[in-house]
């Protein structure tokens, strides 16, 4: 009787594991292939060889790149090189990516930047917020951008128990931001288990010097985040659920879900086209290729444009798609004055003139 019970429990456990594995493959879109959608007048950006996970562009055309991200279990083309912040002036005829100097006292050796966001104060001071993973921990760094010196002055490091696994950030004040946690746990093994079991425990946190709180939760894996041009709505990408959530922002900074847009791809970072309000999305057509790297069958890239996201039927178009022969693992796309920048999780970055 005991053996029969043990065998029954083992069978149930194996069936559950098999079901979870199949569900994970579906969430990763493990069988999906992408058809190429090419853009003319594109070239790879010199100096970006190991990823530009996030990009943010100021209204004056200065673009910031978060480069060199490293995560446990994730492929890296430069595993021993610290990350950094690069800048490109898109007003130049042939813009180049230049690394910004960082003020003394900041630990550059462990700099591991992830999501980034800029905020321009009423006195025109530019702040750069950077999600950082020094030694695979979680902090948010606030810098002041000093344009004349092409440098960043480090102002503050933020750590908080409600920020255990920060992915992306959108600044809404000089020390105020919304941030996504892509996992509930910070321990790598528990992160893998959480993803495998599909617990939907990830969230969005609002941070200010006076208040820190969870303002949205229940995501499979909350990832990219941005804000509408009128500052009334927050957009959140749920990468493994293939969704973009539109949330209304209230005066107390709480969020209320307004709608969910379902897509057929893994949605990463979100950018806003300042000329139209369209949402540009860096996507991973096949997540399994992204996380299990094979140079003979590399991860593909995909960029979507979403028009009228607040309407009942938003228009979704594919701006760019590549099977990995040019660009592997696109994570972000940002546009300025008919110039498109596409960054990747750990590969190169692309500059296109539209």
UniProtKB/Swiss-Prot annotation:
It catalyses: a phenyl acetate + H2O = a phenol + acetate + H(+); an N-acyl-L-homoserine lactone + H2O = an N-acyl-L-homoserine + H(+). It comes from Bos taurus (Bovine). It holds the Pfam family Arylesterase. Coiled coil: none annotated. Glycans are attached at residues 254, 269, 323. The keyword Hydrolase applies. It is found in: Membrane. Ca(2+) 1 binds at residues 53, 167, 223, 268-269. The active site is at 114 (proton acceptor). Capable of hydrolyzing lactones and a number of aromatic carboxylic acid esters. Disulfide bonds join 42-352. This is Serum paraoxonase/arylesterase 2. Homotrimer. One of its GO terms (biological process) is response to toxic substance. Binds 2 calcium ions per subunit. The gene is PON2. Its EC number is 3.1.1.2, 3.1.1.81. PANTHER family: PARAOXONASE, SERUM PARAOXONASE_ARYLESTERASE 2. Its main location: membrane. Ca(2+) 2 binds at residues 54, 116, 168.
């Amino acid at each position: 009787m005991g053996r029969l019970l043990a065998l029954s429990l083992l069978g149930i456990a194996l069936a559950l594991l098999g079901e979870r594995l199949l569900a994970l493959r579906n969430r990763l879109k493990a069988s999906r292939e992408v058809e190429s959608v090419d853009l003319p007048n594109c070239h790879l950006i010199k100096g970006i060889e190991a990823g530009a996970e996030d990009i943010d562009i100021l209204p004056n055309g200065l673009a910031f790149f978060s480069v060199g991200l490293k995560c446990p279990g994730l492929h890296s083309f430069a595993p021993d090189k610290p990350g950094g912040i690069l800048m490109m002036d898109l007003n130049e005829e042939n813009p180049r990516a230049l690394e910004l100097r960082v003020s003394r006292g900041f630990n550059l050796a462990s700099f591991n930047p992830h999501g980034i966001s800029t905020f321009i104060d009423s006195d025109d001071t530019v702040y750069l917020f950077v999600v950082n993973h020094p030694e695979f921990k979680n902090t948010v760094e606030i810098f002041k951008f000093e344009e004349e010196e092409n440098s960043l002055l480090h102002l503050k490091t933020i750590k908080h128990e409600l920020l255990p696994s920060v992915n992306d950030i959108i600044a809404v004040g000089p020390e105020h931001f919304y941030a996504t946690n892509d996992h509930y746990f910070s321990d790598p093994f528990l992160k893998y288990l959480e993803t495998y079991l599909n617990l939907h425990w990830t969230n969005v946190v609002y941070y200010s010097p006076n208040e820190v709180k969870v303002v949205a939760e229940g995501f499979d894996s909350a990832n990219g985040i941005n804000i509408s041009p009128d500052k009334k709505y927050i957009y959140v990408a749920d990468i493994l659920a293939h969704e973009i959530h539109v949330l209304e922002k209230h005066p107390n900074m709480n969020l209320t879900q307004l709608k969910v847009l379902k897509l057929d791809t893994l949605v990463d970072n979100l950018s806003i086209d300042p000329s139209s309000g369209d949402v540009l999305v860096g996507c991973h057509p096949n997540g399994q290729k992204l996380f299990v790297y094979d140079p003979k069958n590399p991860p593909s890239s995909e960029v979507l444009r979403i028009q009228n996201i607040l309407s009942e039927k938003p228009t979704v178009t594919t701006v760019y798609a590549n099977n990995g022969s040019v660009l592997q693992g696109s994570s972000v796309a940002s546009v300025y004055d008919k110039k498109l920048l596409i960054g990747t999780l750990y590969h190169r970055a692309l500059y296109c003139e539209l």
